[in-house]
Amino acid sequence: MASYNLRSQVRLIAITIVIIITLSTPITTNTSPQPWNILSHNEFAGKLTSSSSSVESAATDFGHVTKIFPSAVLIPSSVEDITDLIKLSFDSQLSFPLAARGHGHSHRGQASAKDGVVVNMRSMVNRDRGIKVSRTCLYVDVDAAWLWIEVLNKTLELGLTPVSWTDYLYLTVGGTLSNGGISGQTFRYGPQITNVLEMDVITGKGEIATCSKDMNSDLFFAVLGGLGQFGIITRARIKLEVAPKRAKWLRFLYIDFSEFTRDQERVISKTDGVDFLEGSIMVDHGPPDNWRSTYYPPSDHLRIASMVKRHRVIYCLEVVKYYDETSQYTVNEEMEELSDSLNHVRGFMYEKDVTYMDFLNRVRTGELNLKSKGQWDVPHPWLNLFVPKTQISKFDDGVFKGIILRNNITSGPVLVYPMNRNKWNDRMSAAIPEEDVFYAVGFLRSAGFDNWEAFDQENMEILKFCEDANMGVIQYLPYHSSQEGWVRHFGPRWNIFVERKYKYDPKMILSPGQNIFQKINSS
């Protein structure tokens, strides 16, 4: 056993050295192959394009703060098209990078492939197939290119639903499973990656494998939250439950951050309480659209604005309880008891009763409104963080009441809500803090093409504050410009991440836009 452990350690050290050398050695453009020249193969005729419109579209994402151009775009009609392309790259002396792109909701070019090939996953969506629901086993098999809203529509037809969601449903299944998939349900049901039973994955060697916690388990756990580094998900089996009919939706306003967080932490500690919990902040210099949604009655807008002006920063707690015919007579009593137990500002409690679908798809209304005003396809210099519970008060003082107020440029929602670590799985690749409770903090900014750099600068100021204060903050939907940043990001799990990369994508072909590894070519 001792000899085995020594050999394992030596192998891991060797792998790490190879990766470090590769990362520190720039690959010049004259050695980088051009996929359009390489892929003059009949099997890709009509499926691979280098048209200016296709390349431009693949270079642009939701973030609109960077453009990274591929040489070509693959428009696959089957999984085999993707497998063949990866095999071709892997077997080539000069391999080319390749990235899967779903709905393009990355914010920093993470789904790009400079001088490589971007795979348009949505081209494989077939309305006549791709989603299969098992009512007896309570799962849905879905092609990874489908959007979560499409999955929801299909499962609701049978009275079933997945239990873990993102706030925005127009994201692909494969995209969120490669990152984590979080929202206000995470504290109770876990992120989307912990609600997966099985997947089909194409590795960086062009091999397709079915994996689960019991079959090819290392690949299964590597891919979930793995930022696309180990394989492209083509199918996922998602857990389902009986769908509720409606949602009792409450919001409470706070002026004291400690009471706000204490109430949040108490609510998420209950095993059978609310189904959804999120928090957010309001600042006195923020645009009214940050909070003047249709949720708050117009008659209260002046009251809320006055409180925001007086306190400069206030906090909103949002909770939801799902119900149906069997619980419709008890849900009001449960929510009334919850309201009485909270330390919110009295007189500032708001309530709505909506359908389950309308609640889950609530962001869509805002999206359509912004699109109608030409304010959707704009820069989104987002920053998403995981902050340990013991550091959240320091974060409030230094960031919410410090950097944010001082810079006076807030635009877009700022979320802050806790999650339970025991709902995550350490075998998966996603990086999270070590504490039992940690907070998701999201600066979901919108900016102009002429001023987004100011928001980006503020993001860097926030990150520097957290680093200088040694807060143990970890980025979600991460972006790091150097290998050192990624080593810090994964911490003690970095060596495992490197070993898995070497195992499943040894030529560093997949997802180069994450900027974690550089590709390795044969000599």
Curated annotation (Swiss-Prot):
The modification Pros-8alpha-FAD histidine is found at H105. SUPFAM superfamilies: FAD-binding/transporter-associated domain-like (SSF56176), FAD-linked oxidases, C-terminal domain (SSF55103). Glycans are attached at N153, N408. InterPro entries: Cytok_DH_C_sf, Cytokinin_DH_FAD/cytokin-bd, FAD-bd_PCMH, FAD-bd_PCMH-like_sf, FAD-bd_PCMH_sub1, FAD-bd_PCMH_sub2, FAD-linked_Oxase-like_C, FAD-linked_Oxidoreductases_BP. GO terms for biological process: cytokinin catabolic process. Pfam families: Cytokin-bind, FAD_binding_4. Induction: Regulated by GATA18/HAN. Catalyzes the oxidation of cytokinins, a family of N(6)-substituted adenine derivatives that are plant hormones, where the substituent is an isopentenyl group. Catalyzes in vitro the oxidation of various types of cytokinin nucleotides that are known as direct products of cytokinin biosynthesis. In association with CKX5 regulates the activity of the reproductive meristems, flower organ size and ovule formation. This is Cytokinin dehydrogenase 3.
